[in-house]
Amino acid sequence: MSFRNLTIAAIAGAIVSTTALVAPASAQEEGIYVPLLTYRTGAFAGSGIPIADGMHDYLTMLNERDGGIGGVKLIIEECETGYDTKRGVECYESVRAKNPVVVNPYSTGITLQLIPRAAVDKIPVLSMAYGLSASADGETFPWVFNPPVTYWDGASVFVKHIAEREGGFENLAGKTVGLLHLDAPYGREPIPVLEALAEEHGFELKLYPVAAQDMQNQGSVWLNIRRDRPDYIYLQGWGAMNPTAVREAIRTGFPIENMIGVWWAGGDEDARAGGADAAGYKALSFNGAGTDFPFIQDVITHVHDKGLSQFPRERVGDMLYNRGLYNSMLIAEAIRTAQEITGKSVVTGEDVRRGLENLNVTEERLAEMGMTGFAAPLNVTCENHSGNHDVFVAEWDGEKWTVGQDWTEPMTDRVRPLILAAAQEYASANAGWPERTEPCDN
């Protein structure tokens, strides 16, 4: 395990140390402790690094520009998981005693291990657009949050997108849709929704799992894809799997415009791997790319210009870096909301759980934060812990991400009943799963 105390100004460009740097007890007492479970090493580092830096840099910007949140500094500390579930749980055990106000596992596998712990330890789990889709049911999972959107919502937007391209849902009958996915809990998440929509609309669903050890060697999988000739591919990949899939699609002649990635398959390095031939590749997204937003200019001024970031200045605005910024905005808004609800300056995990459950990021609030056009409004409630945020389809133009299809609402009428049923199934399968006793503030 490796830790970084990020309340101390980081040396620009420094290599992340494997030595634990723990905030002094006095700082722990005076600040709000926000641990970040990250991965800067291993096969998933290409995706993990920009997100880790984005999360760190937004929180650091709040410390530098505003003195923290509500006058209280944020104590930011990283723990390296390597995207490994066992190491992730070890990280959680290491930070748990320091009274974190929220935990971001940044791995579906780690999230699944922490879900049963959250209510016991009184530490909310924020699995931003990842984790267990069923945890969007706040009645069953009062301590787990997955805003702004679930994997099941994303799969429904993908189907909605291809239906629009085909001229209507009725024209999906007889089509073949492939799910190219990491053979892990994360990669398998969209299968139930895709199966349900395939049955409803008459398309055939083909599954193409990729083992973690084969992420950079997908030749056999793409032989199967060439044999089956699916009309569309939904890419639920991560780390080194994504750029490899883009290159393989181009190499085998699969129409790149017909491969659409989930939001975690929409990194700049993912698309850039295909060179000019990757133009037309698409991925779902819920945050903007680029630097043309006032809050990102604040990150540049208060973090990068002061040498407090490890992320290359020229890559600020990359899609996944911006997603890390967005993730930390949710953390910060939950803390701010918790302060408003409780009247406290230094809040606890129990307080921030209430803050997450009352997140209401309006257009006006987005404008106040300098995020107009960067994200859609978000409203989390006691019943709905994801918010069913709109999603847009981003398209790679050969150099950068553009908006290929405007903000699209998930098929909530189809997805929500499946989420509620899956939540009840989870509770039934876990003997003694507690009934919700937490009061509702909305």
Where are these regions (language model features)?
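Periplasmic-binding protein-like
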Residues: V95-T108, L126-M128, T176-H181, R229-G239, ...
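Beta-alpha junction/loop-to-helix N-cap segments that form part of ligand/metal-binding clefts
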Residues: E29-Y33, G46-D53, R65-G138, P147, ...
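Venus flytrap/periplasmic-binding-protein-like
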Residues: T81, V125-S127, L132-A136, Q213, ...
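Segments of small-molecule ligand-sensing domains
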Residues: L308-Y321, A332-D406, P410
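Extracellular/periplasmic Venus flytrap/periplasmic-binding protein
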Residues: R87, S133-A134, P142-G253, G290-Q297
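Extracytoplasmic "Venus flytrap"
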Residues: G31-H56, C79-K86, S107, L180-E189, ...
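C-terminal segment of classical bacterial N-terminal signal peptides
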Residues: I15-A25
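Extracellular/periplasmic periplasmic-binding protein-like sensory domains
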Residues: A249-N327, T408, A422
